Design a protein with these regions (language model features):
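Domain-level marker for long, solvent-exposed, non-transmembrane regions
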Residues: 21-188
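Sec-dependent bacterial lipoprotein signal peptides
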Residues: 1-21
Length: 188
């Protein structure tokens, strides 16, 4: 064999080898249609039930700590909105079923006390789920769920209502608690 014969043969074998190396890769086709999204800290276990108020939220930032603070703040806001709307319903139902002299004034007092209690209790909300992810661009996403005990909330609310002289004479804790628990049971 001469150099003239070996050179074309070597090029042919080299080309075949290179072409064979590329054939082992499989190309994953793009998924068509709907794609299921996994939401951390947002399952059924992280929703309000008859015993607890719960809220979940996310926070995103290039700073890890800021993302975590944002998710906590967003959770607290969502939890406060949920509790406040429930307390307004409970107050309306309780006041309307009771015999208060001035319904509007009593309702306003109950709602003001509810907001005060909720704001004080939010700091005691317990984190029941927390996940932290980092995106390809380096930013962080914090997923969080928090909860607040319904029993603790109604107990603190009762404590505050019992201190209000305008309401104390006509206030019935057991009836209020029953109204509260009935509304909380609807959460599930």
């Amino acid at each position: 064999m001469t150099l003239r014969n070996i050179l074309p043969l070597a090029l042919l074998l080299g080309g075949a080898t290179l072409a064979g190396c590329n054939g082992g890769k499989s190309i994953t086709p793009k998924q068509a249609g709907e794609i299921e999204i996994l939401e951390y800290c947002a399952s059924e276990d992280h929703k309000s039930d008859k015993d607890h108020f719960r809220a979940s939220a996310t926070g995103e930032s290039i700073s890890r700590e800021t993302a975590k603070k944002m998710s906590r703040s967003n959770c607290e806001s969502a939890l406060a909105r949920s509790i406040n709307s429930t307390m307004e319903i409970v107050t309306d139902n309780y006041v309307n079923s009771s015999k208060f002299n001035n319904v509007e004034e009593v309702t306003e007092t109950f709602n003001d006390l509810a907001r005060t209690v909720v704001n004080q209790q939010l700091s005691g909300a317990i984190t029941v789920c927390e996940r932290l992810t980092q995106k390809a661009d380096g930013s962080y996403v914090s997923y969080r769920a928090i909860e607040l005990s319904g029993a603790e909330l109604v107990s603190k609310y009762n404590e505050r209502l019992s201190q209000d002289e305008r309401i104390r004479a006509e206030y019935n804790y057991e009836k209020f608690k029953e109204t509260f628990e009935a509304e909380l049971a609807k959460q599930r």
